[in-house]
Amino acid sequence: SIMIYKSDLLKDCVGEADLIIANIVADVIIRLVPELDAHLKENGRFLCSGVLVTREKDVTQALEEAGYKILERREDGEWCAILAARKEERP
């Protein structure tokens, strides 16, 4: 089943999801990255969009430093989307 939450980042979300989607600016995505592990299932994916191409490197760096692997990126004009997953299993 699909459950959709509207929340201040992941504040009101409970449990774990297969996919978390965020269509917000880079600074907010970077702030969100440390919270992902608590809400993503093992092998879960994080899809973010609303990222200016000029800020893509900042977002990918934050994800990679948190243990995520970039699976795919798409670009449309000055915007991009990034799909990421955990590089390794959680302890």
Q: How would you describe each model-predicted region?
A:
Residues 1, 43, 67-70:
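A generic structural signal for alpha->beta connector loops
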Residues 1-17:
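S-adenosyl-L-methionine
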Residues 10, 18-31, 50:
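A short SAM/SAH-binding and catalytic strip from SAM-dependent methyltransferases
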Residues 27-28, 54, 58:
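Short alpha-helical
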Residues 30-45, 60:
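A short glycine-rich, Lys/Arg-flanked "PGG" loop and its adjoining helix->strand segment in the class I
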Residues 68-91:
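Core SAM-dependent methyltransferase catalytic element
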